[in-house]
Amino acid sequence: MKSCPKCGQQAQDDVQICTQCGHKFDSRQALYRKSTDEDIQTNNIKMRKMVPWAIGFFILILIIILFFLLRNFNSPEAQTKILVNAIENNDKQKVATLLSTKDNKVDSEEAKVYINYIKDEVGLKQFVSDLKNTVHKLNKSKTSVASYIQTRSGQNILRVSKNGTRYIFFDNMSFTAPTKQPIVKPKEKTKYEFKSGGKKKMVIAEANKVTPIGNFIPGTYRIPAMKSTENGDFAGHLKFDFRQSNSETVDVTEDFEEANISVTLKGDTKLNDSSKKVTINDHEMAFSSSKTYGPYPQNKDITISASGKAKDKTFTTQTKTIKASDLKYNTEITLNFDSEDIEDYVEKKEKEENSLKNKLIEFFAGYSLANNAAFNQSDFDFVSSYIKKGSSFYDDVKKRVSKGSLMMISSPQIIDAEKHGDKITATVRLINENGKQVDKEYELEQGSQDRLQLIKTSEK
C-alpha cells in the first residue's frame, strides 16, 4: 500500500493514478521502496543469524572473566597470598579464621601470638618464601599431599596440605598449625580459669598430677588466668613457650600473686618432733623446717601459729598476723615457744617418771617371782594380789594357772611408762620361758596407799 501525496488516498503499490484526485504516481519511487523493503528483509535475516553467535561470544567472554575472578581468589597461589597478607598485616582475626579447624578453634589472641612467633622464629621474608615454594611443589606434585614449614630450630610451625579441589580446576590448600598440650602439676588440688578458643575455660587439676589445659598452636604465651585452691583465689598468668619443648607437651610456668611461707621455730628443742604442727589460717599441718607452706593470696592477711608436745602436754606459740602488704613470693617467719616453761615441765615430769619407774621396777620384780611361783606350785594365790580382782586379766591368769598353761617370765625391764590419773601404762621387756626377749604392754591401776595392781596386758 501507498498514500497519494496530494489527497492522502490509500492505493495499491501497482496503481499509477489516484482514483480520488487523479494524481499520477511516480513509478521510480515505487521501485525504490520495493528495493528498500527487500534489503531490510535481507538484513533482518542476516541479523537473526548473527544473534546466536553474538550471545555465544558474550557468554564465552563472561566465562573467561569468571575464570580469572575465581583464579584470583581460589587458586593455590591466591590462597597462599591471603594467608601471607593476613600475617604481614597482623590481621589476627583473619589468621584465626584460616587456621581454625573443626577440632581446634583458634581465637584472635592465639592468632596474634602465632603471628609474632612466626616473625621471631622464622622471619617474615623466609616464611613467605618457604610457604610459596611449598605450595608450588605440592601443586605440581601428583604424589605429595602435605608438607611442613619449620622454624630455624627445626620445629614444625605450619602444615600445608592438598584437600580436594575448588571449582574443579584449582587444588584446595589447607593451612593448619600443629598443636601441643601445655601441662600443669600443682602441689594441691587447683582450679584454673582462663580464655581459650574464644571461650571461657575451666580446668581442675589434682595435687601432684600432670594435667593438660588444652591444645594450643605454636607461640610464646602469657595467658591471663585465675586459680583457686583451698587457700584462696589468685590472679595472674599461665606462661609457656613452644621453644622449650621437643615433645607433644609443654610445661606451664605459673605466675600468680602468691606468697609461700617458710617457718622457723625457736625454743622447741624439748618438743617431740613428730608432734610439731603449724596452723595457718586455722588449717593445721605437720611442721617441717625444709617445707614451704602455701601458696596463699598476697592480697589477704595471714594468721600463723605453731604447737608441739612434751611429755604429752601441748605447748603453743603466740599467733602472729602477717599483713598483706608484707607478703612476698617467699615470706619467712619465726615462731617462738616459751622454752623455760617447757623445760620446767619436762624436768618435773622426768622426776615423776623416774619415781614411777622405780615403783614399777619393784612391782614387776615381785610380780615375776609370784607368777613363776604360781606356775610351779599350780597355786593362783601366789600371784592374785598383783592383779585386780574382777578384771578380765585376773580371770585369765587364774584359768591359766589351773590348766598349767601360765608362762614363766624373768628379768623384767621398764622401757616406758606413763601415768594418767590413777591409770598407768607400762612397756616391759621380759624373757619368756623359751628364752626369748619380748615386749609387753601392761595397764595398771593405782589404788589406796599407792598400791599397784594389773588390769590387762598385750603384746607390743
Curated annotation (Swiss-Prot):
Induction: Strongly induced by teicoplanin, vancomycin and oxacillin in strain RN4220, a restriction defective laboratory strain derived from NCTC 8325.
UniProt-recorded Gene Ontology molecular function terms: zinc ion binding
PANTHER family from the UniProt entry: MEMBRANE-ASSOCIATED PROTEIN TCAA
Principal location listed in the UniProt entry: membrane
Ranges in the topological domain labelled Extracellular: 71-460
Phylogenetic lineage: Bacteria, Bacillati, Bacillota, Bacilli, Bacillales
Gene deletion effect: Increased in resistance against glycopeptide antibiotics, especially teicoplanin. The resistance phenotype is lowered by several folds in strains carrying mutations in the rsbU gene which codes for a positive regulator of sigma-B.
Keyword field: Antibiotic resistance, Cell membrane, Membrane, Metal-binding, Transmembrane, Transmembrane helix, Zinc, Zinc-finger
GO cellular component: plasma membrane
Membrane topology term: Single-pass membrane protein
Entry's family note: Belongs to the TcaA family.
Cytoplasmic topology ranges: 1-49
Pfam families listed in its UniProt record: TcaA_2nd, TcaA_3rd_4th, TcaA_5th
Gene: tcaA
Cellular compartment(s): Cell membrane
Protein name per Swiss-Prot or TrEMBL: Membrane-associated protein TcaA
TM region(s), chain numbering: 50-70
Function: Plays a major role in decreasing resistance to glycopeptide antibiotics.
Zinc finger region(s), C4-type: 4-21
UniProt record, GO biological process: response to antibiotic
InterPro entries on file: Mem_prot_TcaA (IPR023599), TcaA_2nd (IPR054529), TcaA_4th (IPR054530)
Annotated organism of origin: Staphylococcus aureus (strain NCTC 8325 / PS 47)
